[in-house]
From Swiss-Prot:
It is found in: Cytoplasm. Keywords: Cytoplasm, Fatty acid biosynthesis, Fatty acid metabolism, Lipid biosynthesis, Lipid metabolism, Magnesium, Metal-binding, Transferase. The keyword RNA-binding does not apply. Transfers the 4'-phosphopantetheine moiety from coenzyme A to a Ser of acyl-carrier-protein. GO terms for biological process: fatty acid biosynthetic process. Belongs to the P-Pant transferase superfamily. AcpS family. GO terms for molecular function: holo-[acyl-carrier-protein] synthase activity; magnesium ion binding. This is Holo-[acyl-carrier-protein] synthase. Its EC number is 2.7.8.7. The lineage of its organism: Bacteria, Pseudomonadati, Pseudomonadota, Alphaproteobacteria, Hyphomicrobiales. The gene is acpS. It catalyses: apo-[ACP] + CoA = holo-[ACP] + adenosine 3',5'-bisphosphate + H(+). Its cofactor is Mg(2+). HAMAP family: AcpS. GO terms for cellular component: cytoplasm.
């Protein structure tokens, strides 16, 4: 059963300006080490960071909190499976809120899609509760 849906659309230029203005202060505040390593290797660095930023916003909306209630940017991280498929890993308050959303006997599955078409980046998150027996 679906227990949360979130989406976000962001202007890549806004993220590029934040990186130019604040540099590591911005990237270290909002992104995990894995996200920074992946984005810094990209030719389109700003687009890579923007997609991850949009994913965090979408995830916070799917959790029903936004970036509030103790949920911080780095509590939500975009990681890629060996196939390249992006997924979200939650920690801290985000993980606790997700756990509180789950019906008894269920485990979470977070589905994520991210895309960009300059000057926009977009993310969709669906949080699903799956029976533990599956």
């Amino acid at each position: 059963m679906i227990i949360g849906i979130g989406s976000d659309l962001i202007d890549i230029r806004r993220v590029e300006k934040s990186i130019e203005r604040f540099g590591d202060r911005f990237t270290h505040r909002c992104f995990t080490e894995i996200e920074r390593a992946r984005s810094d290797r990209r030719a389109n660095r700003g687009a890579s960071y923007a997609k991850r930023f949009a994913a965090k916003e979408a995830c916070s909306k799917a959790l029903g909190t936004g970036i509030a209630q103790g949920v911080f940017w780095k509590d939500m991280g975009v990681v890629n499976l060996p196939s390249g498929k992006p997924t979200m890993v939650l920690s801290g308050a985000a993980a606790l809120i997700l756990e509180s959303m789950l019906p008894a006997g269920h485990r979470p599955a977070i589905h994520l899609t991210i895309t960009d078409d300059y000057p926009l980046a977009q993310a969709f998150v669906i949080i699903e509760a799956l029976p533990e027996s599956l």
